[in-house]
Amino acid sequence: MLVLAHTGRESARRSARQVIERLTAAGIAVRVTDAEVPDLQCPGATVVPAGPEAAKGAELVIVLGGDGTLLRAAELARPAGTPLIGVNLGHVGFLAEAEPEGLSRTVDHLVAGEYRVEERMTLDVTARENGTEIVSTWALNEVTVEKAARERMVEVVIEVDGRPLSRWGCDGVVCATPTGSTAYAFSAGGPVVWPEVEALLIVPIAAHALFARPMVVSPRSVVAVELLHAAVGAHNQAGDGAGDGEPGAAEVERAVLWCDGRRRFDLPPGARVEVRRGALPVLLARVHGLASAPPGGGEFTDRLVAKFGLPVTGWRGRPAR
């Protein structure tokens, strides 16, 4: 098993050492990356390069940290087809399976092989300039096309399956998976989508338009975001004429592409970004609800209630059938 941790936190380093000691005591081979060895100081682990081969052949990747650490781990686990399991040492930690107080119990399940694996939909992303591919990447949570300058909007046209849908002057556009519906898309006003639902979400960010609502489309759809060439200063939000006499339209319509808030790519004016269902899913290991989870996404419902502190007082239970 490969163990990854947010080594900038003492709690994560301490938990990682605890996990490694318990796994090695159970006779399970453990890997850590060379980037984390100085911080973890675990002599019982095998050191591997912190690259795309780190998770190859591993049974699991155990991640100790927040959602950001798990997203980093997903970049290693996805190409290897290795499941991830997260222990939340961050804030919300929506992707994590366990909290710190349940760490020992979670490790016991893993040692005994008592876990199930879920597939989570991903996104494949390409960006082109004048028909030439300039970016090819992927995301687990979301892809965002955002303005590069705080004082300016971007002008975009949204296309779904080869047909134009709407033109927006906006701060950006989020294209998200169901897994990402509780992340940036949620903060931008998008709906929460249960992970069993197969869909793509399109969520505008602060759009100046009458029709600018979050939309849910087929998982087979291809969503395109095209950056338009607009007039100089056409979207000076301050309204003070600051756009007068400034450089050309390239500055006005320059934008950035973010994938999972981790990988950033500059987009030139006129760029086209296409988002579709990813060819490879991310695999998440689960130890909760192995036999007792109610049908219809009950485990996810409980996770929503716990993570967001939703009020459920007055619920009288499921009626007898």
Q: Which stretches of residues belong to each language-model region?
A:
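Short, acidic/small-residue loops that bind anionic groups at enzyme active sites
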Residues: 80-98
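ATP/nucleoside-binding phosphotransfer catalytic cores, i.e., glycine-rich phosphate-binding loops
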Residues: 145, 161-164, 213-321
